[in-house]
């Protein structure tokens, strides 16, 4: 299994995206969070289709921090069920991956 992962999280406002990004990095749960503004999201929720503008957070971290990160996001997110999806990083620039290891707490 890969030691590192990218996690996608959506937020409904810039303020919330900034709060989550900063909180994850300050808590050493993430090395870097990139924010894409005004993502067009179409999704099914509570028996209907919704279309919203959201902010997409791309989080770079360690696999062993996923559970702690998920808990932190659920406790600090305005959505009842926030999008939190993790994908393994199979390859990457070694110096960048070392940066993740140097910043993010290891279990």
Q: Which sequence ranges carry the predicted segments?
A:
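Positively charged, small/polar-rich N-terminal and surface patches that mediate targeting and assembly
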Residues: 1-107
